Amino acid sequence: MKLGVILPTFRDTVDDALEVARRCEEQGLDGVFAYDHLWPMGSPTRPSFAPFPVLAAAAARCPSLHVGPLVARVGMVGPAHLIDQFRSLASIAPGRVVAALGTGDVKSRDELEGYGLAVTSADQRRSEMELIARALRDDMPVWIGAGAEATNELARQLDVTLNVWDLDADRLTALTALGPVTWAGPVRENLPGLLDELRNAGVQWAVLAPGVDVAALAHWRDRGGC
């Protein structure tokens, strides 16, 4: 199981994010990721860095790390633009980009409307996500954020990876029986126990939210966790 960390991008500067990326590479972790939010959920006055520039900077500084948004939300920009963003990032980090995609949900509405963006239907967003995934899947790993059953089924039809947020071990095991799954979620008090559960459920990646102890992740790996 590969280990990744979501960078802290709800900040006034990118310094913290790049420092976390440096520590991840120093500890031999596998990748870093970044949220794709116009502002932190429910906090429109707080800063939020766009994921692709931060990931490009991290990739240029840390050549061993995989990088990707978690997840790039379909519908905020046109499909062709989003495809170009992934390909531009891949030109900086060839072979190291994860194209993680999501359709968003009702919680995304305030952000989109706050920036004057249209809120399209879930069916339209899924259609655009399929177009993007088909365009990229031969060049880089594609993850689709789990959600509605129609979205989960699309991931299986496309033979790409399903990415889940903070799902428990029992439901994970059921999903991994159907196809590849990656997990992302918040840090828990018993980090080694969480990682053991994810590994035993057959998860391919565990990606921890900002604030995780990077050294503790490396320690779990070094004692044979992966």
Residue ranges and their predicted role:
Residues M1-C226:
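Active-site-adjacent structural elements that line small-molecule/cofactor binding pockets in enzymes
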